[in-house]
């Protein structure tokens, strides 16, 4: 018996209940209670299940049933609310401009689909007279796209009127519109387009009339009378020589006859003052001597009227007073070509103009 009792006790103790565990372990009980108390003080209590789950509320069944009943009752009544806007759409009447668009040969997208202004009026439900009057004006833009075909008689009369007066007063415009079987708007638009065409034509004609001013300015720049005012420096002197080459007939005769001094003296002074010009005049690209036979063969040239005395011995005499580079070019055996000789003579004439 004792064995069985102990066995039973051991069986019971082998599977203790939760209450026995809590009573046998007071520390666990205290920690459980204190932790639950702390959590209850720190964390706000959650809402009751009745609030989180409305169906658990005592009156939820009674409240939700009426809602469901109301929804069931409103369900068949949902289509009727859209019909109120539908009756509002017919109040927008069909204006004449709508019919014109539909009957036009090239119907635009606005003819098939209502315009924004027309759709805005039914949506807002405002049928004021001002909005109704504004619709034809909005559609007037579509009507203006249609091109008006004027007859020859109408064009002739309009051109005649435009010739006398480019701007029409309203009484005259009404009179012409009635005479030509046109609307006042068509006459006004035709005159606007005709004025723009006239403006373009006059603008294209003006540039040719204003062009002659440019050549005159160029003539003033290239006037040979301003050449003596050039400075004796190298670049300006070379530019003057180049301009003298461009106008040899105008420069050479007057230059040679204006200064009675011998050419040798003039050449010596020019070589001492501006060696750059003298070097270029002496054929800086292909230097060579000035033999006597070259001048004898070129005496008939109009550019050499006063060079008969310019012989080889005079060149040797002049070489002493010229720069070393010019002297070397005179001693070179390479002969001058005719083009280089012409350039040389014209350069000498330009130097005479700079140093009178």
UniProtKB/Swiss-Prot annotation:
Compositionally biased residues, Pro residues: 77-94
Pfam families: Homeodomain (PF00046)
Residue ranges with Polar residues bias: 52-66
GO biological process, one term: rhombomere 4 development
Main location: nucleus
Subcellular location: Nucleus
Disulfide bond annotation, renumbered to this chain: none
Residues within the DNA-binding region(s): 143-202
Composition-biased stretches (Low complexity): 106-136, 227-240
Modified residues (Phosphoserine): 274
Motif (Antp-type hexapeptide): 94-99
GO cellular component, one term: chromatin
Residue ranges of the region described as Disordered: 39-142, 197-240
Subunit field text: Part of the nuclear protein complex gamma-globin promoter and enhancer binding factor (gamma-PE) composed at least by SATB1 and HOXB2.
Protein function: Sequence-specific transcription factor which is part of a developmental regulatory system that provides cells with specific positional identities on the anterior-posterior axis.
Protein name: Homeobox protein Hox-B2
Source organism: Homo sapiens (Human)
